[in-house]
Amino acid sequence: MEEFKRNLELDRSQXHDFIYPLIFQEYIYALAHDCSLNRFLFFENPGXDNKXSLLIVKRLINHLITQIYQQNHFLFSANDSNQNQFMGYNKNWYFXMIFEGFAIVVEIPFSXQLLSSLEGKERVKSHNLRSIHSIFPFLEDKFPHLNYVLDILIPHPVHLEILVQTLRIWIKDVSSLHLLRFFLHESRNWNSLTTPKKSSFSFSKXNERLFFFLYNFHVCEYESIFVFLRNQSSHLRSISSEIFLERIFFYRKIEVSSKDFKAILWLFKDPFLHYIRYQGKSLLASKGTLVLMNKWKYYFVTFSQCYFYMWSQPRKININLLSNHSLDFMGYLSSVRLNPLMVRSQMLENAFLIRNAIKKFDTLVPITPMIGSLSXXXXXXXXXXXXXXXXXXXXXXXXXXXXXXXXXXXXXXXXXXXXXXXXXXXXXXXXXXXXXXXXXRKHKITVRAFLKKLGVGLLEEFFTEEEQVFYLTLPKASYTSGKLYRRRIWYLDIICINDLSNHE
């Protein structure tokens, strides 16, 4: 509060304009409280508290607004046009600050920012987790041999009211909801939220973090019907009397849903389906035949047209035959190898335990695309030699180490499912050497002398830090699937993955 008072004293002429951000913070607190605490901030970790204090959320947002405001308070000169002003400040900066605040608030339940409160607690292992990007298991999970992959590119224009309705089920405070609607519409008047690109639509970079989150959560809510259909239809052909009543229940559900799913309900017979939405694409891998994949293609297109009024572009749907156990996924070629494994598994909830022998697929991420991504960020050369970025040399040594640690963590997150961590270790070593080179350039000494002065403590965090993934559950079932759907979630960091895959 003292920092706000000092800023207020420096800008007495616009004191009435500065009051509004202070009021806006209270709306942010209400949004964060209703979104993250009332709906689904419940950890599946022993010893962790199931509730968080609103004061902690207020301090987090208060720190965010303070830092952004202090960094940009004196950046506007007389060259700024009055036509691009909002509440006395530049619209570009003001809306960027607001949307960044909203993005952090809505990601609080999924973000790894609360991991510090779980130190020393046992965390749930990442087995059979799903992401907000996919209602089905990840391609990196354990699955039998897949034959085909379906690549669908469907435009996703998003109406503003749809985004507001996505948050409506979270927010109990009506004033906060109206405030969010106001900023969304004001942003549309200031700059379009979606920009045409390659016969599709992609969010502008300034707002992609918030709107990708809202869009993926919105689609994920509707896609929960997939879980029910695949869960029940996977054992329809069973002759066991134990599931007779369950089959009757499922047939009654089919009669209710027959108006919307007439000719496509029988497609859900193959339980080995893996699906993900990423960068405007929908990827579906299956063990089925080409005929089955064609019918899945028809279903997904029909689903998008019925629920989201999206019409796919011609030649934007491809069915590729998988060969050599490889799949072009997330910007790099993700290879897998077979490991026989005897498991006692339960594929989905409400399904029966099965003892079967499957082949475990371990993801092998090549080192070349990772080095290419580091090279694009000027952290390494194309030959994997560490390089000191000129921009990092002007920053503090702690900031350079933190940036390199973030790059290493992003590489480790992408290769989390890999059996051999040689590729991730090489990428982490390149990032660590780049941080040391940048710090040595700043102090104008050699890298050897810099490491000798500080010891190996600088590089320990790159190799000794354990996997940090934030796990939680949905205690309240999705409104489209009743009480049958409750899954653990792993939130895929969109920004980090976009940077790692070097996506334009």
UniProtKB/Swiss-Prot annotation:
Keywords: Chloroplast, mRNA processing, Plastid, RNA-binding, tRNA processing. It comes from the Eukaryota. GO terms for cellular component: chloroplast. GO terms for biological process: mRNA processing; RNA splicing; tRNA processing. It is found in: Plastid, Chloroplast. InterPro entries: Maturase_MatK, Maturase_MatK_N. One of its GO terms (molecular function) is RNA binding. Pfam families: MatK_N. Its main location: plastid. Belongs to the intron maturase 2 family. MatK subfamily. Usually encoded in the trnK tRNA gene intron. Probably assists in splicing its own and other chloroplast group II introns. This is Maturase K.
